[in-house]
Each structure stands twice: as structure tokens, then as C-alpha cells.
């Protein structure tokens, strides 16, 4: 049994620092790098790509809405399908250019924050993200929230997909993530999170915030780099996976 561990990194901006990227990148097998719209800048992107290359970690673009003040967690309404496609393609291309400079390669794309949340329920947004990925590079892997509209969008365009579950987020009964505005949406107990994820992987099921069991395919588990205690959570999870005979490897080998 094998699983990929992914983390959202490169989310600092200028002199403002977010998370402990150097520590998290040692614990992840793939990382998603902010591309300057919700967070990140050219220098931060380059630094993060350099770290990933040095550690042999796969990198992906993490495009979001243009919303630095809100960290990409606020919806941007009224965008057309073509505007959404351009927004996503622009950010993928930015990271590809930085990666080329660093001698590394972008392997996947995972939407961020409100862009991802909306796409999980809205076919037009989901299709726009998938279309942008295919137009830029059809070999890029599409990281999708398991059981969401993103899955159908990726399938329709023949994209390779990796189904994602979250270590540090609670789930609603319909398989969607509990809104960050609600109590209990973000989990913080490292040991409890680690044991929860082990059970998820072993059973292929997620338990919702009300106790409902939901079947999900899971190829990769996300730990948010900006979650307080993220490093401790990642370390506890790596240990729990090892103790339970679950190998950790980049998603291209995940089953």
C-alpha cells in the first residue's frame, strides 16, 4: 500500500513569510507552489523550486484567484470560462518558466482555495481549469478533490488525475470540505490526524463531521503548510504511516 503526501508551499510574499517550507518539503513527496495570484512571487517561487529539486520532490502549479489580501480564499464572481482558463494557464506558465530556470519540471496542477472550492461544485469552473491544463500541457497531472466535479471535468478531457483527500480538514456528509468559517473545519491534533489518515487509507473511506462514512479514492493526502503545527502533523503522519506498513512515494507510483 502506497500513498503520496502533498503540501501547498511557496505561499510567502516579499518580506512576509508563510509556513516552514524547508521543513515541510523534507516530509512531502510532492508540493504545490503558489504562482503569484493568491500568494507567492517570482523570488519565492524560485526558492521553493530550488528546495524541491534539491530534495527530489515533485512540483506542481497551485493556481488561485487574484486575491493576495484574502489569500485566494474569497470567491471572485463573474469570470467567464475563457477568463478562468487564462487565469489558470498564466499561473501554470509562470511556474514552468521558473522551473526551467532551476532545471526542474512541473508535473501537476492543483487549484487553490476558493477557485478549487467553487470548481468542486460548479461544472463551468471545473471545465475551465481542466481545459487550461490540457491546453498548456496535456501530460500534466490534474490533482482533484475526490468525489468532486473536478473528476468529471478531468475525465472528459482525458487528463491523468490524482484523487486527493485532506489530512487536516473535516468533511461534510456530501464529501465536500467543511467551510473554514465553521468550527471544527481545520484539525490540529497531530496524533489524532495521523491515526485518522491511516484509517482512511486502509479503509478507502472518510468519516464526515457527523460520523457518516464516505467511500473515496485516495492517491494523495494533503497537509496544508499554513496550518498551525503543520510540521508536527506531517512528522506524526509519516511515523504513523511507517508504523502501519504504508509506503510514502510520489503519486506517479501511488496505487
UniProtKB/Swiss-Prot annotation:
Enzyme kind, highest EC tier: hydrolase
Function field: Catalyzes the cleavage of 5-oxoproline to form L-glutamate coupled to the hydrolysis of ATP to ADP and inorganic phosphate.
Gene from which the chain derives: pxpA
Subunit-level organization: Forms a complex composed of PxpA, PxpB and PxpC.
GO biological process: one example: carbohydrate metabolic process
Protein name per UniProt: 5-oxoprolinase subunit A
Species, as recorded: Nitrobacter hamburgensis (strain DSM 10229 / NCIMB 13809 / X14)
Domain of life assignment: Bacteria
NCBIfam families: PRK05406.1-3 (NF003814), PRK05406.1-5 (NF003816)
Coiled-coil annotated spans: none
EC number annotated for this UniProt entry: 3.5.2.9
Lineage: Bacteria, Pseudomonadati, Pseudomonadota, Alphaproteobacteria, Hyphomicrobiales
PANTHER family listed in its UniProt record: 5-OXOPROLINASE SUBUNIT A (PTHR30292:SF0), UNCHARACTERIZED PROTEIN YBGL-RELATED (PTHR30292)
GO molecular function, one term: 5-oxoprolinase (ATP-hydrolyzing) activity
Reaction catalyzed: 5-oxo-L-proline + ATP + 2 H2O = L-glutamate + ADP + phosphate + H(+)
Gene3D superfamilies attached to this UniProt entry: Glycoside hydrolase/deacetylase
Keyword terms: ATP-binding, Hydrolase, Nucleotide-binding
Pfam family, one: LamB_YcsF
Family statement drawn from the similarity comment of this UniProt entry: Belongs to the LamB/PxpA family.
Amino acid at each position: 500500500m502506497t500513498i503520496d503526501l502533498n503540501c501547498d508551499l511557496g505561499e510567502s510574499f516579499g518580506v512576509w513569510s508563510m509556513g516552514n517550507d524547508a521543513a515541510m518539503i523534507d516530509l512531502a513527496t510532492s508540493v504545490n507552489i503558489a504562482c503569484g495570484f493568491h500568494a507567492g512571487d517570482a523570488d519565492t517561487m524560485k526558492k521553493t523550486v530550488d528546495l524541491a529539486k534539491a530534495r527530489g520532490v515533485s512540483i506542481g502549479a497551485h493556481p488561485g484567484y487574484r486575491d493576495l489580501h484574502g489569500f485566494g480564499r474569497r470567491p471572485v464572481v463573474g469570470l467567464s470560462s475563457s477568463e478562468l482558463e487564462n487565469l489558470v494557464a498564466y499561473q501554470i506558465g509562470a511556474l514552468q518558466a521558473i522551473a526551467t530556470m532551476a532545471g526542474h519540471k512541473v508535473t501537476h496542477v492543483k487549484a487553490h482555495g476558493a477557485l478549487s472550492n467553487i470548481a468542486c461544485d460548479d461544472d463551468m469552473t471545473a471545465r475551465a481549469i481542466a481545459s487550461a491544463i490540457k491546453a498548456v500541457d496535456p501530460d500534466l497531472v490534474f490533482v482533484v478533490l475526490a468525489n468532486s466535479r473536478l473528476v468529471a471535468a478531468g475525465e472528459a478531457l482525458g487528463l491523468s488525475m490524482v484523487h486527493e483527500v485532506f489530512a487536516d480538514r473535516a468533511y461534510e456528509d456530501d464529501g465536500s470540505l467543511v467551510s473554514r468559517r465553521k468550527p471544527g473545519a481545520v484539525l490540529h491534533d497531530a496524533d489524532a490526524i495521523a491515526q485518522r489518515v491511516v484509517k482512511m487509507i486502509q479503509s478507502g473511506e472518510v468519516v464526515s463531521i457527523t460520523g457518516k462514512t464516505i467511500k473515496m479514492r485516495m492517491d494523495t493526502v494533503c497537509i496544508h503548510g499554513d496550518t498551525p503545527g503543520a510540521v508536527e502533523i506531517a512528522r506524526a503522519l509519516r511515523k504513523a504511516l511507517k508504523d502501519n506498513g504504508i509506503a510514502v512515494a510520489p503519486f506517479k507510483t501511488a496505487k
